[in-house]
Amino acid sequence: LNLKALLAVAKKIL
């Protein structure tokens, strides 16, 4: 997992 993918998921949750 890279940071960009993690941020994309976090944005969807938030």
UniProtKB/Swiss-Prot annotation:
Its main location: secreted. Expressed by the venom gland. It holds the Pfam family Mastoparan. It comes from the Eukaryota. GO terms for molecular function: toxin activity. GO terms for cellular component: extracellular region. The modification Leucine amide is found at residue 14. Keywords: Amidation, G-protein coupled receptor impairing toxin, Mast cell degranulation, Secreted, Toxin. Mast cell degranulating peptide. Causes hemolysis of guinea pig erythrocytes. Its mast cell degranulation activity may be related to the activation of G-protein coupled receptors in mast cells as well as interaction with other proteins located in cell endosomal membranes in the mast cells. Belongs to the MCD family. Mastoparan subfamily. This is Mastoparan-C. It comes from Vespa crabro.
